[in-house]
Amino acid sequence: MTVILKSHAKVGVYVDAANISRNGGQRMQYDVLREFACRDHAEPLRLNVYLTYDEERAETNAVYRDKARAYQSALRELGYKVIEKRVKWFQDEAGNRYGKANADLDMAVDVLLQSENLDRVLLATGDGDFVQVVRALQNKGCRVETLAFDNVSEELRRESDMFVSGYLVPGLLPTRGDDYFAPGWGAMGSRVRGYCYHHDDNKSFGFMRFLVKLSPYLWKTDSRDPDSPYRTAFFHDSSLPDGFNVMKLPSRNHIFEFTLAEPNGKQPVATDILLVHPALS
């Protein structure tokens, strides 16, 4: 088995919190995000979170103000720098008020300026406006990884050196029924998320692939490799969600959440399968 040596890479993490929260990642665990970004024991040189803050609302709503400040404090305890983008209020011709707080420009400028000292950048966003930022970072010699959940720009996926769905990262987002007493991700009886990489249309069964640990070897997808961080689970089509079209399988774009049951042969069995992404139409 390969021995993982300490990396000398310097990493920057930049989180577009509004985009992530609006698109499936509202309960994202920032400590796990940091661990994922530094999965090869790299040094986290920059950890930036861009948050919106409604100062006008905070003046009249103590609950909002206290929760927002407590959330920011929790992020700082994890080593993140919190960059606050204040909501600006406007009024249209009909007299309706609306707020704006776009942190895209701030985040883009920061990552470009700070990339001089970085080897790798992780952008937590699905916003296609960052495509040019990705290209600029790559031209400066940085490896660029992106992570998001729903409504991800296809162009952003393609331009990134690696795109990872946040749904697949162990522990990054709580699973259904996740609590203190639940088995840990990857253990028998636990809930995990993965995708179907093989499907037999004639015999009506397939195999799910899922991550069991954070690892620098994400490219080793063959679970037979002892260094691979992936495992597989067998499933029968009858266990898939009602209404799901099996002709779409295999697919890396359809992410399922399922329970790992006792092995039927070599692989565990995926049961109680839910479609997490995209939503079942």
Q: Whereabouts are the PLM-identified features?
A:
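Domain-level signal for Mg2+-assisted phosphodiester chemistry and nucleotide/NA-binding surfaces
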Residues: 1-103, 143, 147-151, 263, ...
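Short nucleic-acid-contacting surface segments enriched for D/E, G, S/T with interspersed K/R
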Residues: 228, 238-257
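Nuclease catalytic cores that cleave nucleic-acid phosphodiester bonds
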Residues: 66-189, 201-203, 207, 240, ...
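Conserved RNP beta-strands of RNA recognition motif
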Residues: 204-209, 253-256, 270
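Intrinsic-disorder/low-complexity, polar/charged segments enriched in Ser/Thr/Lys/Arg/Asp/Glu/Gln
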Residues: 189-193, 255
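A short macromolecule-binding patch
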Residues: 215-239, 269-272
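Short aromatic-glycine-enriched beta-strand elements
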Residues: 201-222
